[in-house]
Every structure is written in C-alpha cells, then in structure tokens.
Amino acid sequence: MEVQAEMEPTSSISLVAAVSYGIASMAMVFINKAVIMQYPHSMTVLTLQQLATSLLIHFGRRMGYTRAKGIDMATAKKLLPVSIFYNANVAFALASLKGVNIPMYIAIKRLTPLAVLISGVLFGKGKPTTQVALSVLLTAAGCVIAALGDFSFDLFGYGLALTSVFFQTMYLVLVEKSGAEDGLSSIEIMFYNSFLSLPFLSILIIVTGEFPNSLSLLLAKCSYLPFLVILILSLVMGIVLNFTMFLCTIVNSALTTTIVGVLKGVGSTTLGFVLLGGVEVHALNVSGLVVNTAGGVWYSYAKYRQKKAKPAKLMSDLEAHKK
C-alpha cells in the first residue's frame, strides 16, 4: 500500500506535465505565427524570449520562489550542446513558419518521434516494444501522406522544418539524459539553456543582418497596442513552454514529449485550417493528418500498457519545485 501511495503522485505529475506541455505547445505555434506575420525578425523574437526566461528565473531565485541552483561552470559546459541544439531547433522552426502553413508545419514536426525513436536505439536505450515502434511509424507515414496533399508546397520551408526536427531530436535526447544522470530539475535546465543561449543568439542576429534594423522596427511596432500585447504574450508563453517541455521530458521521456506534440496537433491543425487559412484542403492532406493522430493515440495506449506492467520510478525533479 505504501508503494502504491508513492506511485500515485508520480503518475499524476507525469500526466499533468504531458497535458500542460501539449496545451502550451499548441498555443505557442499560433502566437509565434501571429508575431512573425507582423514582425518577421524571428531571431530577435527568440532572443527576447530567452532573455525574459533568464531574468525571471534569476529574480525568482533571489526572491526565494525557486530552489534552483545558480550557474556552475562545469554544469554549463555539459549543457552547452543542449542550448545549441535547442536554439537551432527554434530558429529553424520560426524561419520555416514564413513559408509553411500551420497544419503542414505540425505534420512535418510529427516526424520527430521517429527521429527520437531511432536516436534512442543508436544511443543504447534499447529496442522499443513492437506496438511503440509501429505507432511511431504510423505517425511518420501520416506526415508523408499529408505532405503529398499540400498544394502550397514550399521546398525551402519544408527543408527548414525538417532541419528543425533533427535539432529538436538532439536536444530532447540530451535533456532526458541530463535529468536522469545529473539530477537537474526542469527549472535548472531551463535556466542554463536560456543563459547559454544569449551569447549565441546575439551573434546570430548580427550575422543574419537582423540587428540593428530589428530593434528600430521593434520599438516602432511596440507603439501599436495589439502587437505589444501579442509580443508580451509570446514572451510569457515562451517561458511556460520551455518549463513544461523540460518537465515533461524529465518526468516522462524524450519520446513521450514528442508524441504529446503529435496529439496536441489535432487542435492546432483544426484551428490552423479555420483561423489562419492559407491551406488548400485536399483528401490526402486530411487523410495524412488523421493517420498522424491515429498513430499518436496508438502510442499513448501502448505506453499506458507498458507503464502498467512496470513499477513507476520516482523522479528527483519533484523536490526541486518544493519551497
């Protein structure tokens, strides 16, 4: 009975982390799209999001709202690859949104579970169960079918989105490893990630030519209240998304985090068709998205069965969020 009582909070946290990440991820796609439609400097937006994250956690530590540790150089060196892959993923994802409509962007990003599954085998995590492997393959097949029905096909945009998939795979695998091996909490990983991102992003906005034009345009745009509201919402949701993503990856796994991204795509895709338009609906497009969703549901069922068959392990990450 004591073991059962211990397992229940862990299962609850796992579910809350997954659902929270799904909601935040879905909202962030639309918010980023809304910002970029009015302000095309995606690297500057990403820099502002990371700066806001660093400042919030720093002052949160000073005021005693979180027990996250300060910057340690040895840990920073170990997490530097996470930061590089994370920012490369977001940078390519933001850039791809300029040429890819939201439903197809979501479909392409649904290739990430397959990439994570393959990387897990290559990095020695062992072979997945047959049901998990088949459900992930079904999800990837849905992406291909949906792409065949996309009449607004943008080769460059697709290339950027696929590159984003690679970088997302790498940083999720590294985050899962860092949480398991180094005992870092989601807030600590988020703090290191945002802090280490700032020099990299500062150089990037200069090299890409965004700065200083992006700054002058930003100041001019901020005088327009609707844009200012969307920008602030983007900064807040960037923090929420990072926290829920890292928490979900540590509490669950990198593969589960990507599958949550697949399941939240149902709502994102529907809203993308209705609200933002720019999509010529075709039977292949719709069929592919349905297959995507079926693969995600199948995966969820397979992992549920797998978790019931194994004792759930307690996560040290929970202690980091207690005052």
From Swiss-Prot:
Bilayer topology reads: Multi-pass membrane protein
Instruction: Cite the record's tissue specificity text.
Output: Widely expressed with highest expression in roots.
- Ranges facing Cytoplasmic side: 1-10, 59-78, 125-132, 176-186, 248-252, 302-323
Q: What is its main location?
A: Golgi
Localisation per UniProt entry: Golgi apparatus membrane
Phenotypic effect of disruption? Early proliferation of lateral roots as well as distorted root hairs when cultivated at high sucrose concentrations.
From the Swiss-Prot or TrEMBL record, give the protein name.
UDP-galactose/UDP-glucose transporter 7
Originating gene? UTR7
